Amino acid sequence: MKFRRFSAFFLALLLAALCTFPAGAVTDDCTQETNVTTILFTHDLHSHFLPQSTAEGGESGGYARLKTVIDRERAVNPDALLVDGGDFSIGSLIQTLYTTQAAELRTMGAMGYDAVTIGNHEFDHKGTGFAEMLNSAKAAQQAAVELLRVDARPLEDMDAYKERFGPVTPVLPMLLEANYAPADDNPDRAFIRSAMENYGVTDCMTLERGGVTYGLFGLMGVDSDECAPTSGFTRTDAAKAAKRCVETLKGEGAEIIVCLSHSGTGDSLASSEDEELAKAVDGIDVIVSGHTHSTLAEPLVVNDTYIVSSGPYCQNLGSLTFSWDDGGEKRLLDYRLIPIDETVAEAPEIAGLVEQWKDMVGETYLARYGLTYDEVLTRSDYDLNTPASAVQENNGLGTLVSDAFLWADRTLNAAHADSPHTVSVTADGVLRANLPAGDLTAAMAFDVLSMGVGEDGTSGFPLVAVYLTGKELKAAMEVDASVTPIMPAAQLYMSGAKYAFNTKRMFFNRVYDAALTDVTFDESGTENAYEIDDNALYRVVTGMYSAQMLGTVKSKSMGLLSLEPKQANGTPVTDFADCILYDANGNELKEWYALAAYLEQFGEDGLPDRYADPANGCKQV
């Protein structure tokens, strides 16, 4: 890359040879002390413990491979910091251990992370789930420390530990958060605060490494907070919190200030929260920027602050190296995004730890569905990828998921309603992973729809059924047509309805043709079209999160679109928990399981060709 020159190690040797001062302690004119700092970083890991297949036929991610690269980098730069910018959870089946085992934080401790911050997805289990996770992490750590305190422990002690906690993990990363705390009116405030204090969550900290005192703090962004509506936390102004932390850390002797921010960057300054933060606050040397899943090939430099992002899902380990002198002048020496791919060997200790997590998932979560982690459900002869950003067209994965919801409602829902017509809906924003060509497993199905937690307290949003008038159903189509260009996550995929729109027409008036369709689930997919009656009530099956978002359309469109989810009798829904679908055993019908069961029924025949190039659904002209 542009700034890749040579490692900090060789730079230090060269400077020492030229100026006869200790390595890393001179500048070009040999009059001011110069230090070299290396920061290794990730963000938005989303529980990607295991590698994922790529469209190119390779693999990306996996914590055992990440650990290998971390060790390799620290062999060259032993004083390097290792930090994370939040959203370390929610994205694979291992997240089902979040509240009970804290697998994410414990594994990050085993990989050598110094400090992390929290993101919106750490609150998918609500504020109480976050607190339970912290308590689980601390309990496991304390038990591990006690277990290892004496050289020879009885075998039964080790067996008892593993039965309760799984892997032995005596180290945890520091958890930093300076502007996000339980709201005063949160009824669980005392419990959450106690858990945070028990773990040792703090707003900022100093860390000495290689004779240098570093100051670190964590922040939650505006959009990130909005993406955590059930957190029960209150966010304070990021710039004010940052100024307070910088002042505190400087007072404690910090020479380099690092902000772990779950705020993100955007295409413009107005949408780039971390650029605004750097502009508003002096004294921050580095911002590790998470939330927007950005991959910055070069650091952004704003107000003498390096803003760095390595991309999501453990795709890369970021490495930033810069020199600095006692006058505060910095010089970028090296910036790399190191791929975590199939060419990297797995670190055996982390690979073994991950296998233990997989076994626990099978015992505690998948068993109730009669599935195993790597069980093959069916196969596909083609890739099904998540939608491209701001591309308004049919998508095979979106169509597959919406069909799966409708199929599950008809097949698995214990109380399937005998309604005149049902439409199923999913949204771009909840599709979290691709389905690559080849064998499709239970874990892959979960990865696609891994968000959220149900009213039963277990991972995965449940399906819900609500009712919309025909006019409101058309309004939902208009959301797709008009809002998607500025908010790609709003793109919708429907089964049981189709529509066409023209992006050159007026905003919120782009849909010009809409109809209901029969869905047969045979090779033809759909047949017969019916007119939508504006005044009739139509049943809509979707995920809990998508239903909640549909309920915000009126306020988000400033009243231009009216859409209010209803009960079958036409009264407005006041609690979506009343709309959850259940299977014959009384279990919540989860989004991911609807997809898994739909895939499984294709068996050895594999996915039909219609999902390779879906012709039904929306059409842009």
Where are the language model's segments positioned?
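Acidic, metal/ion-coordinating pockets
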Residues: V26-T343, L400-D403
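A short hydrophobic/aromatic micro-motif that marks alpha-helical segments and, especially, helix-coil
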Residues: A17, A102, Y306, T484-P485
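Generic detector of low-complexity/intrinsically disordered segments
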Residues: L13-T20, V83, D518, L560-P565
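Gram-positive cell-envelope targeting signals
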Residues: M1-T27
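Generic alpha-helical secondary-structure signal
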Residues: F9, M133, A476-V479
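Catalytic centers of hydrolytic enzymes
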Residues: D29-T38, S47-E56, Y63-A75, A110, ...
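Short hydrophobic/aromatic-rich motifs at helix boundaries and adjacent loops
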Residues: L15, A102, V246, H291-T292, ...
